[in-house]
Swiss-Prot record:
This is Large ribosomal subunit protein uL2. Transmembrane segments: none annotated. GO terms for biological process: cytoplasmic translation. One of the primary rRNA binding proteins. Required for association of the 30S and 50S subunits to form the 70S ribosome, for tRNA binding and peptide bond formation. It has been suggested to have peptidyltransferase activity; this is somewhat controversial. Makes several contacts with the 16S rRNA in the 70S ribosome. Residues 229-244 have a biased composition (Basic and acidic residues). The gene is rplB. Part of the 50S ribosomal subunit. Forms a bridge to the 30S subunit in the 70S ribosome. The lineage of its organism: Bacteria, Pseudomonadati, Pseudomonadota, Betaproteobacteria, Burkholderiales. Residues 223-275 are annotated as: Disordered.
Length: 275
């Protein structure tokens, strides 16, 4: 992968930085692993907006990614690496020895032709998946399950990883990129290495239209609204916020804790670092 700074041939391309990956497959994705994707545009089942600034964008197919990696003991060959419009990471198409094909999140350094395997006897090599009880302490991992057999839920985005810190009884401690240390059951599976496409965070979109292609709509400032629309709205001429920054519903937007999931508090050993 390489970063390419685009020549400023127009105002929209000035400052644009692209991530170029010449090793990605240029053809169509594997048709058997595609599903129809219906855009909700940030609406719930009642048609009410639950996530603002969503809508439009290019049509996409959903790529069915294998987050369970439960074909134990069967080697799989990497057929190709592909772009996935639904996530920041790239995906890899695996062809198993029995002929089945599955997509996985492509780890850093994975090459076409490599052989991957999952299970308790899999070697400690990037892309292989094992239960956490079989992974050495200090290993860098990604695609971590939170409930055994449910499928990977943590460390799945581009460049993400975690470190296996310790094992105590039936639980292990995993340190995430945010600094949070979390307890995970040792029967949960994780993949060795870190997620690829680590330069994704260095790209510069360049123009608003590119965000519209991705289904992201403009964000309007609260101070530019009317008082009925936002707590910061109203006033004669240009005015400041006149109060602490809040959301449209009055919730403080600077450092206010909104976590409600008390059920899993006992799984967090150390809170994430404050920015």
């Amino acid at each position: 992968m390489a970063l390419v700074k685009v020549k400023p041939t127009s105002a929209g391309r000035r400052g644009m930085v692209k991530v170029v990956s010449p090793n990605l497959h240029k053809g169509a994705p594997h048709a058997a692993l595609l599903e129809k994707k219906i855009r909700g545009s940030g609406r719930n089942n009642n048609g009410h907006i639950t996530i603002r600034h969503r809508g439009g964008g290019h049509k996409q197919h959903y790529r069915v990614v294998d987050f369970r990696r439960n074909k134990d003991g069967i080697p799989a060959k990497v057929e190709r690496l592909e772009y996935d419009p639904n996530r920041t990471a790239h995906i890899a198409l695996l062809c198993y020895a029995d002929g089945e094909r599955r997509y996985i999140i492509a780890p850093r350094g994975l090459e076409v032709g490599a052989t991957l395997i999952s299970g308790i006897e899999a070697p400690i090599r990037a892309g292989n998946t094992l239960p956490i009880r079989n992974i050495p302490v200090g290993t860098t991992i990604h695609c971590i399950e939170m409930i055994p057999g449910k499928g990977a839920q943590m460390a799945r985005s581009a460049g993400a990883s975690a470190v296996l810190m310790a094992r105590e009884g039936t639980y292990a401690q995993v340190r995430l990129r945010s600094g949070e240390v979390r307890r995970v059951h040792i029967e949960c599976r994780a993949t060795i290495g870190e997620v690829g496409n680590e330069e994704h965070s260095l790209r510069q979109i360049g123009k608003a239209g590119a965000m519209r292609w991705r289904g992201i709509r403009p964000t309007v400032r609260g101070v530019a609204m009317n008082p009925i629309d936002h707590p910061h709205g109203g006033g004669e001429g240009r005015t400041g916020e006149a109060r602490e920054p809040v959301s449209p519903w009055g919730t403080p937007s600077k450092g206010y804790k909104t976590r409600r999931n008390k059920r899993t508090n006992n799984m967090i050993v150390q809170r994430r670092k404050r920015k």
